Each structure stands twice: as structure tokens, then as C-alpha cells.
Amino acid sequence: MLNIFRLRLGALLHFLIAIGHLICLFFLEEAFKAYGILDEMKHLCFGQEWLLFVVTVCLAVGFAIAGLYALSVAGDLRKLPLRRMVMIVIVGLYSIRVIVGIDWLLYEFTYLQFFSTLVPALLVYCYLPGLK
């Protein structure tokens, strides 16, 4: 029962993150500035402003799909393909994100970076039952 709650919580967090990314579309440049990644994102998108929006929408879709997989593993949705592999990838990617985030925090602590590391750590905790 606790494992199902954890998976549902992880799904909820992913849906909230996806909605947050979509909301950021209205002030995308300011959001990138707040995270200090504006120059990196512009370089990544070859200076094409419209690609920043496409990347953000794709990220939102990816977060929503991750939430759907958590609900599928919890038994709330039909079984999606490659559930176990997708759960392993999600936990693996977020584990790497947590390790990198801790390294950044040791270098320069900011509350934004702290919460940007805490949320992936919580998602790893929520998605671990899906590996069984």
C-alpha cells in the first residue's frame, strides 16, 4: 500500500513539474535566467528562440509520460510497454541528477539549487518500488 502511495506521489510530482514547464513558456527567458542557464540553452538551440519553446514542451511531455508510467506500475492505468526498463531509466537519471546536484551544492549553495536537488531525490524515493 505504501509503495502504491509512493508511486502515485511520484506521478503527481511529475505532472506538477510538467505543468510548471508549460507555465514557464509564458516567461521562458526569465525562467532560464533564474536558473542561470539562459546562455547554455541558447547555445544548445543554436540561437534559435523557437527551439527553446520546443525543448521546453518536449520536457513537459517527458515528465508527463514519466508520471503515466508511475500510475501504470501502481496499477491505476493499463500496463504500458517496457514498464520495468522505463522505471530503471527514470530512477537512474534522477539518481545521476541528485549526485550532480549535491556536487553543485557543495561548490555553491543556493536554495533554488537545493530544491532542484531535493525534488529528484524525492522522485527516486517514490519510483524505487517500481523497480520490483
Locations of regions flagged by a protein language model:
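Membrane-water interface at the C-terminal end of transmembrane alpha helices
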Residues: 121-132
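Membrane-helix boundary connector in multi-pass membrane proteins
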Residues: 99-114, 131-132
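C-terminal TM-helix exit segments that contain a strictly Trp-centered aromatic cap at the helix terminus
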Residues: 19-29, 96-105
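Juxtamembrane helix-break-helix junctions at the cytosolic face
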Residues: 67-84
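Cytosolic juxtamembrane helix and N-cap/initiation of the first transmembrane helix
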Residues: 1-18
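Hydrophobic alpha-helical membrane segments
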Residues: 85-101
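Interfacial loop at the N-terminal end of multi-pass membrane proteins
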Residues: 20-55
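Core segments of transmembrane alpha-helices
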Residues: 55-69, 119-121
